[in-house]
């Protein structure tokens, strides 16, 4: 793995979403959402996403909820809107769950895996924090946030 992409499905029509993945050479999408079955966009639901990516475009799909924040963290952030507190807690969770090794265990055989979440903007999304942790452990890793 020399490159890691991140993407959020919100605010993206299906065609744009797929084009971003294909143009970036993504060969594995790792779904880092805790809840991935009740999203508004039909294509973003777990089973639909897996079928679409694999059958339509030859992109593997893997849901790893271990890479998501806890429900308590999501609820706290929804109430407080305190990004700094959320970020600090999630960075602790990255270490506690050994998330970087979990990603590497699943993605090492792929050229360009992509972390998928719902947030359009990676600035305030846990996928950015996870990508930063991976980049810190792999100095030659290029991270691209697809928008």
What function would you assign to each model-found segment?
Residues 1-147:
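Residues lining hydrophobic/aromatic ligand-binding pockets adjacent to catalytic sites
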